[in-house]
Amino acid sequence: MISKRDLTIYSPIIISGILIILFIYYIFSGTVRPSIDDIWVINLERDTDKLQHVIKQQYRFPVKINRWNGTYGKDEDRTTADKDGVHFMLSRSENAEENNRSNKILSKPGEIGCWLSHKRLLRDLYKMNVPPNYGHLILEDDIVVQTDFSEKWNKIRKSIPTDWDIVYLGINKMVGDRLNEHVFRWRNDKSPGNFGTHAYLVRHRSLKHILEKLRFMTAPIDVQFYNMLGDLNIYIIDPPLITVNADLESSIDKQQKRVV
């Protein structure tokens, strides 16, 4: 049985030990190279062909691909979208009669559906009980993955700075500063660029900050990232490891024609 005298002697030592452990964890938890710990592909229920297109590439990845049910903008109620940050002014028609006939999204349903899909997935990932350095790879369903992806990724990840918040494994019209042979530091300036959200890795501990920036929709998801995430440590792999299949029609383009 532990006496009061023992507690008096050893308590400061135990407390000091715990504080040292926490300090070491705090210092070194941020010095971890990016890793792909889970993979999520955003896919609409109706796009079964695109899902099969992604599944056929499963063998190129180190872990299993999970499917996230994407939001089909044309089927989304404006009221529900508003609760998730899409103001009525963005989703309603300029025609009052059309708005009275339908409560569905009537303006740019593809862009809004895409934005909601990414935000809802990120919000769900944020709720997961995983380590802070856990890496979530988010994909869209029109991707093309290099056949030697794992080999290249395992090599390139070692050259990505440990302060990473997001790593783009593919992007369009890159804007960045070269760090080494394969990695660029994302740069925000007046020139448009860094388009596309078809393949990006998110550090779990960064999700809270990202979601704060996505509280309200201000632009298509990739443009909003570019406009609002400049204070994060974002890196781009170039040449890309994952690209977009131009032969597959974009889900955004399919929905963009307004239907009432």
Language-model segments: residues:
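An acidic/histidine-cluster motif and surrounding catalytic segment
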Residues: Y10-L139, I143-V260
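Short, low-complexity, Lys/Arg-enriched N-terminal segments of secretory-pathway carbohydrate enzymes
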Residues: M1-T8
